[in-house]
Amino acid sequence: VLARGQRLKELQGHGLWYRGKTRTHKVEVKTISELKPNDRYQFIFLTVRENQVEEALEDISKNKSPNVVTMINTIKPYGRWEKICGKGRILPAFPGAGGCIEGGILDAQLLPRAIQPTTFGEIGGRKSSREEALAYIFRKSHIPYQIVPEMHHWQISHLGVIIPLADAYYQSRHPEKICANEKLMTLTAYRMKKNLKWIAQKGMLCPAKLYMIKDMPTGMLAGVLSRVYQSEFGNRFLYRHAMHAPEEFQRLHQEFYNYMKTHTKESNKA
């Protein structure tokens, strides 16, 4: 694990603590404070926020490990990232997990496969041996995963869902109780459906189960969303994340709707 500052001190001094179902566990992890040019790894997993990714890739560019798995929420294509760290090194992905670090303890959990497995795929959709190697690692680690032919489309579709979900928290005076706000649930359902319809019109909507959400009556979807927000799943994977990362979600909100606006104008010109 590459860590710096206070987090490095915590890991070196106390190990990695994580919260299980009934108790807190400790595991020893090997830590490094820098990535040296001659260090060699089969995969480098990059798990930073989008506004930190280019700086991180600048550091990685000095190292010659062949595969950089970018587990990052983004709407941008991957060309600029490849220019920074080298063409052919980026393997775009997104984790099927959620949680946060509180008091130095990791409180996180894998998402069920039916909701969102860890997702990855080669740029351009080609098959590769490193895809198979990464899939093998996930299988041996009992991490649900899926390989998709167009990761950029998947990430746009993901943002079309998650941004309205996060926006609802920020619009409420009582974000911990939004499940009871029928008007806000209806508005969130409407926004989500509108996003997915636009993405589908552009031929980018995936996975296929999102078509069911797109075509669901708004009132029915609002009821489903209310139950999701009220659930332990909603608390762990939606509420905590939104409350810990408002700036990230606000930036993604702006980038997503700017993307829609720009590509709508381009379509109208054509």
Language-model features and meaning:
Residues 1-26:
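NAD(P)+-binding Rossmann beta1-loop-alpha1 motif at the extreme N-terminus of oxidoreductases
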Residues 7-12, 76-79, 128-130:
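Short, charged/polar "capping" segments at the starts of alpha-helices
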Residues 23-107:
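Rossmann-like NAD(P)(H) cofactor-binding subdomain of soluble oxidoreductases
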Residues 79-158:
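Rossmann-fold dinucleotide-binding core
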Residues 107-122, 170-180, 232-243:
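Helix-loop-beta segment of a Rossmann-like dinucleotide-binding subdomain
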Residues 127, 131, 184-192, 245-253:
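Generic structural signal for well-ordered, non-membrane alpha-helical segments
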Residues 152-196:
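Active-site-proximal catalytic alpha-helix in oxidoreductases
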Residues 193-196, 200-270:
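NAD(P)-dependent Rossmann-like dehydrogenase/reductase catalytic/cofactor-binding core
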